[in-house]
Amino acid sequence: MAISTFKRKIASVRVSVASPEIIRAWSSGEVKKPETINYRSFKPERDGLFCEKIFGPTKDYECACGKYKGKKYEGTVCERCGVRVESKEARRKKMGHIELAAPVVHVWYLKSSPSILSTLLNIPARDLENIVYHGSRRIIERSYIITDSKKTQFAAGDVLYETEYEVYKKVLDFDAEIAVTVKNPKSPVVSDIDGEVSIKSEQTNTGREIIWITVKDSKKIPIQLQPGMILLSKNGQEVKEGTILVPEKQIAPFYAPFDGTVEIDEIASTLTIKPLTTSKEQPVTVTIPYCVRVLVKNGSKVKAADELLSGGTIPAITSPASGKVVFGKELNVRPLEDDTYEVLSAGMLYVEQLIQEKRYPIFEGSLPYVNDGDKVKAGDYLADRFLFEDEVLSAHEYKIFEDYYPQQFTVEAEVENDRPIVAVTEIDDELSKETGLSVGSIITESEYEAYKELYPGKIEAHYGAAAVKKLLEKIDLEKLKAQIESELSQLPRSSGKALKLLKRLKIVKNLIKSGTKPEWMVLEAVPVIPPELRPMIQIDGGRFATTDLNDLYRRVINRNNRLRRLLDLNAPDIIVRNEKRMLQESVDSLIYNGRIGKAVADRNGRALKSLTDLVKGKKGRFRRNLLGKRVDYSGRAVIVVGPDLKIHQCGLPKKMAMELFRPFVLAQLLKEGGESSKTARKMKKAIIEKEMPEAWDILEEVIKGHPVLLNRAPTLHRMSIQAFEPKLIEGNAIQLHPLVCPPFNADFDGDQMAVHVPLSAAAQAEAKYLMLSRYNIISPAHGKPISMPGKDIIVGVYYLTAIGKDFDDVKTEEIRYRFGSTEEAILAYSLGYVDLHTPVLAKVKVSDQEKIVKTTVGRIIFNEIILPDLRDYTRVFGKKEIKNLIYDTFKRHGIDATADLLDDMKDLGFHYATVSGLTISLKDLIVSPKKDEIIRGAEQRVEQVEEEYRRGFLTFDERYREIIKIWNKATEDVQFVTQQALGENPFNPIFMMVNSGARGNIDQVKQLAGMRGLMADPSGKTIEIPIISNFREGLTSMEFFISTHGARKGAADTALRTSSAGYLTRRLVDVAQSIVITTTDCGTHEGLKAVELISDDLTVQKLKDFLFGRVLSRDVVDPLTGEVIKNPVTGREYVRNAMLSDEDAEFLAEYVVSVPVSVEQVLDLQGLQLPHCYAEVCEEIRTVDGVYYEEGTELNWDVVRNAKNAGKKQLKIKMYPVVGTISEQVIKDKKGEKELVVLREEIDELTAKILEENGVSQIKVRPNIYVRSVLTCEAEKGVCAMCYGMDLSNHKVVNVGEAVGIIAAQSIGEPGTQLTMRTFHTGGIATTADITQGLPRAEELFEARKKLKEPEGIFSTETGFVKDIKEVEGRQKIYIEDYSGGIHEYEVPEKTKVKVRIGQKVLPGTPLTTGAIRLRKLMDTLGVEATAMYLLKETQKVYVEQGVEIHNKHFEIIIKQMLGRVEIVDPGDTDFLPGQLMTISEAEKINEKILRENANAQSNRNFVLGKILAKKVVAKVSDEVEEIASEGTEVTEEILEKAVESGVKEICIYDEGKQITYQIAPKEPMRYRRRLLRITKASLEQKGWLSAASFQQTPQVLTEAAVEGSIDLLEGLKENVIVGQLVPAGTGLETFANIQIEETPRAAEAEKMA
């Protein structure tokens, strides 16, 4: 039956942002409850995360309640339980959703770097996050306290923060003072002195109370006052010392006014006259003044006018001291009219002399502990505090307390507050102008409250995802685009602001292009993935284990339900706000746990795996499941050697084969029985299971010609999977042919291999004809054999073809045995007349000729298996000779002959290795007698050096270097004499092993039987004490200790290498995977100049190796004749597009001719043919119309035409045949000081003239050879077959469809493990730095590291001569003189050494010093080709140093990917950003398209007239973004003119019902420059998002791709593996899609054979 292999099913994959509608459309129901399953019945809970109604039934075709069972009810929805009857597979596909009670921002868009939402909304990421998470902004601001509220609603003492104050102050009239906040007031208030307390209170300017507590300490001087005295001072009045308190007073005598009786009261000091009873007078009382005598006695009777009191004087009283007047408590006074007092009774007056007084203000609310008049002691408490913590004081109040309590409290003039922030979502235009706020401005909540109060209804602000959503809904993308574009047109493109705008513009354009609404980045509903993808499993002990996702979903549902409940209850805002934040956080951790804040963890502290974790990283969906797919039909087993197999066979254990081929056996059994019923199947299965004999017979039949694939992990290159024909064997191990071990890197010490069975006919055909091991003998990495005999086979062949020590001494005539044919010789051997190594003469046939040769029977036996034209009876065959023999066989006779030769060689080798009886014993290790003498000599020389050092003739470093040198020489000498001693007996087993190349090398023999030599210490520095012993003699303990460093380092190295090498391979594969041969010939004439690769005087690659396997891009011309070169042996002409084999490469590499520098000639202008080389005119030419050519003008057709016009018949010319050739010798000037031409320099006309001036007539040169290379290929995708050249695995031109990128990556990555990690030390000398080698160097180059491990070297940028090298101000400088005499100065960097000498000729790129060259610098100064060649040379060097051979083309593919991008410098009118990267071909195409469309702009304008607009036209007109025309408008001349004037370049119209964009004004093309990318960056820069996402930074790549609505056209290999299609390479290409494959029945096949 004819079947077509495949048709491509999926053409492209698009990723975009899902709208809430789409999320709901995906869903089959809303998940409302966090429950999963009922723990009693184990049934899913209704409306829970495993609900059957939403996700489908748990049992096939059965509803939840069991009412409907069976497939016949499919599609029925059960009315009882609501479950739809369908296959349980639905639970893998059906999704649910959670309706969110509040919108939630998708964390990918919020926290991508740079944040997409932040860029789009033009809000700083920190602020945006704070809005989303209901956060706050830390604000440091002043506060104000109101002192006079005037007519506002404020009260005195209200506090306003600066932000609100500014808002209110603009509109309202009130007075306020700057406020301060009190911090750390000391308490309680303590009296500092003894004294008396007085208390009073007062009000401050903010209307608050201050209580003043005063404590006085004083001394009182008492003054006795007597009645009648007049007191001049008031109570409390301050008086000075000597002030008159009581004035002097004259008192007149007192006479009785009438007759009466006298009563004297001595206590009251009064005198009373009582009248007679008959008199009408009233009694009179007078005070007896101080210092007056009473002249009468108490009770005596007196007559009127009797003198009662004598007169006298009251003396004046002055103040004894300065102080305050204080009235005593018993002092009784009467105020008089003139502000004085009359003393009524005796009492005390005090002058209080104040010693000290202290006042203590305390603020309202503080509690005083004392009362007025209390006496206190120092240290007594007066009040609990004077101020409260965080009390806000006006400046005035602060001043009071600062004066009275210095340093007892601190204040903060600015308050640091975390203020909740909101985003403005709507604002009135006038208010916006007035306040400077706009939609999207972030303000604090208090500011918002102020604005809302002052401008009700004119401003709206929100927080949380709702705010972001509102802001996103407000965005008019078209308008925003026009606005950004007009802003950009006024900025320099490289400015920071412009770059920010460009990033924003890119997002806006991407959203427009993909048709995504910005608000979709905020989730209204969260999709719930199918339950089977997040299963719950019962584990032992009845508990359930669940996927982390269920926990994360549960948190979301719980918080969502709680928020819904709070909203229904109208809970306080602060609670709702907190719940919204928690909901946002729970959705974040569901999508990307740990991206924001601390990751949600389980009870063991392990972070839960969120949806993002399922996608990203090595264990994510991409790398684990999509790219790391498992292969069906496979078994694995240990491998053992199968020495009797053919190279294309493998031994398959019977049991394993039966298991693998079971379906085939079953089918065959059924076919033979001709039945297919269920019972028949059962019976036949039983036959197989019981292993009946007929099952084995059929297995034998089925297996015939059915190849199997064997794979050994790690699969480092394509040779790690090969096809074999299986042979059934007993036992449980797979038998493997010994010769296929090298490609698999397998050995038989317990390695395992996997077996895969190709099932379809197409797969079998591929395995048989492409993957069979006999077709994989040649390595695609270098084109040489890889399936090579090793170890014992080599020893066997070597033993067979080896000769005794005296073979060469035996003369022909002395030889006893002479044979007429090879058969005779072999017969004589088998009969025991001669042994293998006896010299014999035999008649042999070599390439169709018979001749007699002196040989041995062993050599005759070996040559029997070789094809006649390759036989050689005169040499011994070691590893190298065998490799060459295999390679020559392949080149001359093809792969099949090679495979047969290998098989024969294996049989011979094993047989004769056994016959040879190879063993090793200690006796075989022969220690040379000369060893001791060499060591003694070295020790003496070391002693001399030490002596010189002691005398001070040598520095420490010089001594160290000398000693190392001496011991290195001694070690070499010992090695040489050891080798000699061993070679005495050619059949010494160790000598045979080493000499044949089977195992070990002379270095190891030196350590076994010579001396171990010098060792390195852990830092890599050489230890100067050598190990003099060898292992045969045994080491001393000191020597043993010194040896351990290296051993440990080796072990550590190996472990580190493997992982680094694996990662390097992965990056290489990633960067090159999309390079496939897409076409036979791209037609380019570009190419690389073939050169020898030389780095630091080490020939990294010979010219012939550079040429091998290449295609010529130009004819190779003989410098002398100008004709195409022809190979005299093969007759091949080396014209353009000829592919070079080994022989061709060798011939061209050695093609050197001696050419004259210049030749003078007369050119006949009649029979015209221009010379084949560069030539100049030797005379002046003047034409009639004034054209003039001076002597020395280059000859070309213009010159010839004008010479003819000038009437010339002949023209004197000078030809320079050397120009354009490659010099093969160094030529110096006459003095021998200056190099005129260096080796391998391309000679230009200037150089040729310099040679001529210096009298050089002839020079040896080789032709310039240009080969095609992938670096210069112009194929649109991938590369073309001609530029790639030879497929190294079969030496033919590569096939279209070959995945050369992956082969390149494998070829470079596979030997990675062999590369050392070490950074070698150059004998511990400080001046030259460590040389980075091996893997780190390879990585440094591929990753184009900016930071180099070794110091940076410098290179020449000119062609010229080294004029001078000298030290200027402590820095070494190199001066180079160019051809025109200009001098260029180069400063030698520190830690590097000069590599050039005076008089040396340098070319651009010649390194002037040691050290690594910075790739980007090289690229900027010398361009792409020089960089590519440097990279090629340096990467090759890393591998060559380790003895690894890899063809250049593999490196070139990687380098092509590193250099294949351009960076946009100025995007012109394209949608790209400066700094964006794209491939060269894309950039060229875009510019071509722009130029093409610019030509059509005018005709497009005519075409669109009268058509209907599909999208509105928006542009910035005089500072305002205006709509020029709305959607659905007819296009008119006016609209077009206005649009073009405003800078609109294209419009979108309806044309025949479709939306088509037409360009209506010329656009600016973009400018770009080549960029060098490191391989990781190059991988991420790939076009398709699938490939980039599966490489690194998965979430970031997917986020950007979704916003862009990116479409992956599945061009690379990875993308197709991910979607599960055949890869577009090899037989997966469209070209092979229609091949018809027919499966011929076995019987018919057998008939044909017969």
Swiss-Prot record:
It holds the Pfam family RNA_pol_Rpb1_2. Keywords: DNA-directed RNA polymerase, Magnesium, Metal-binding, Nucleotidyltransferase, Transcription, Transferase, Zinc. GO terms for biological process: DNA-templated transcription. HAMAP family: RNApol_bact_RpoC. The RNAP catalytic core consists of 2 alpha, 1 beta, 1 beta' and 1 omega subunit. When a sigma factor is associated with the core the holoenzyme is formed, which can initiate transcription. DNA-dependent RNA polymerase catalyzes the transcription of DNA into RNA using the four ribonucleoside triphosphates as substrates. PANTHER family: DNA-DIRECTED RNA POLYMERASE (PTHR19376), DNA-DIRECTED RNA POLYMERASE SUBUNIT BETA (PTHR19376:SF54). This is DNA-directed RNA polymerase subunit beta'. It comes from Pseudothermotoga lettingae (strain ATCC BAA-301 / DSM 14385 / NBRC 107922 / TMO) (Thermotoga lettingae).
